[in-house]
Amino acid sequence: MKVLIIQDQMLTKGGSEKVFTYIAVCFPYAELFTLSYNKDTSLAFSRSDDLNTSPIFNMLIRKHSAFKFFFPLLTYYFQFKNFKHYDLIITSSATVAKYIRKFDGKHICYCYVPTRAIWEVDNYFPKKTFIKKVFNIFLPWLKSRDLKTTN
């Protein structure tokens, strides 16, 4: 059985990152994937050498603040990435990994809802910045899409 475990990003020492590391230990032969990993700011874990990243996003997103900037675009990354050669995909998703495209195998999502970036915008973007203004333009569409994906 070909198994893939996905985490949105590994840039902080948060709860979803901890869950991801525990799942990775439970499935020692699974492939591991995240959009971006920063070993200096994220959790150290036994399988960090096995962690695959998106080369482009790993280069662009080295801090959590950059992840916020790219959030609307990142939702599409998982929708268009081809996962058809996996039998099982387990996602630990607070934001974007839950958007994976349907495939023939099984998808188990440990989904942290609501997605704070969408439903608690003032906490996620506390200042009136350009990024927040642009994000607010996409907000109704992102909320609709988030509801559809999580249901």
Where are these regions (language model features)?
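Short catalytic/ligand-binding loop motif for oxyanion handling, primarily in non-cytosolic enzymes
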Residues: T12-K13, D40-S42, A97-R101, R116-W119
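Active-site proximal beta-strand in glycosyltransferases
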Residues: L88-T91, R101-T129
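Active-site donor-binding segments of glycosyltransferases and PAPS-dependent sulfotransferases
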Residues: Y29-K98
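Hydrophobic anchor at the start of a short beta-strand
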Residues: V3, Y29-A30, H107
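Membrane-proximal helix-turn-helix segments that form the acceptor-binding/catalytic region
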Residues: K127, K132-N151
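Short, conserved loop/helix-junction motifs that constitute active-site signature segments
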Residues: A24-F27, F83-K84, Y99-D104, T150
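Short amphipathic alpha-helix
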Residues: S16-C26
